[in-house]
Each structure stands twice: as structure tokens, then as C-alpha cells.
């Protein structure tokens, strides 16, 4: 299986409006005579490549530490889409994924600038997929 790195560079990717930009600060530097290098790093949890756990949108949803890591590793179906993903779009994406490769259909990546509608989110959540991701 070929593995694709779709992670975004933290300091080069777009920051969600209203969120603080990531920052890094050199605390210790061997170049300045210290015995080691040390850097402090801060960022909003929604910057760069990240996971939105169910808790992000569901009051009693699971937090990131409670998620099963196996859901994040494996074959995935990539569906290119731009704009709002509707109920019908979600249904069609799931059907096409299952037709093309049932194993890959367990993890669906939406490629493009998308917004998942509430109706589409419910379809994805009620299906048997393990992961829904967005890669711009």
C-alpha cells in the first residue's frame, strides 16, 4: 500500500479567521552558547493538519484521546468536491466509494474547498465509515 502524506505545513497554511496564528520561540540555542537547543511552540488546535473529534460538534462526543487510532490508518477513498456537500452528495460519495473499493470506503477524504451540510454530516455519521476527512 502506498502512503500519501497530506499534512499541511503548520507555518505556511491558512489560519481560520479569528484563530491565533502559530508561533515558535527559541528558548535555548547552542549557537548562543547553551548546551542544547529548545524551542517553544504554540498554535490553535484547528491550525494545520488536525483531527476534529466528535466532541468538537457533539456535546457528549468523544474527545481525541478516546478515538481509536486504527481508524486513521489504511486505504481511503478520495472524492473531489467543491462547495457544500449536500445529503445527496454524501449518499453518492458513499455509494461510489463502496462500488470502487469497499475497504477504501471505510475512510473517505473530501478533496477540495468543502463545507459539509448538517444533512450530509448525518449521512456520513450514520454510515459504516470510520473516518471522514477534508484535504483542501
Question: Which sequence ranges carry the predicted segments?
Answer:
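Active-/binding-site microenvironments in catalytic and ligand-binding cores
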Residues: 1-136
Amino acid at each position: 500500500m502506498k502512503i500519501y502524506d497530506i499534512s499541511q505545513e503548520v507555518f505556511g497554511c491558512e489560519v481560520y479567521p479569528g484563530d491565533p496564528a502559530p508561533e515558535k520561540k527559541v528558548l535555548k540555542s547552542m549557537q548562543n552558547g547553551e548546551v542544547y537547543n529548545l524551542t517553544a511552540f504554540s498554535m490553535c488546535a484547528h491550525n494545520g493538519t488536525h483531527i476534529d473529534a466528535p466532541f468538537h460538534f457533539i456535546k457528549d462526543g468523544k474527545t481525541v484521546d478516546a478515538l481509536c487510532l486504527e481508524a486513521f490508518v489504511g486505504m481511503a477513498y478520495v472524492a473531489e468536491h467543491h462547495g457544500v456537500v449536500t445529503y445527496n452528495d454524501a449518499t453518492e460519495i458513499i455509494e461510489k466509494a463502496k462500488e470502487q473499493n469497499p475497504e477504501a470506503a471505510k475512510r473517505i477524504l473530501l478533496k477540495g474547498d468543502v463545507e459539509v451540510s448538517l444533512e450530509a454530516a448525518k449521512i456520513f455519521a450514520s454510515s459504516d465509515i470510520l473516518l471522514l476527512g477534508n484535504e483542501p
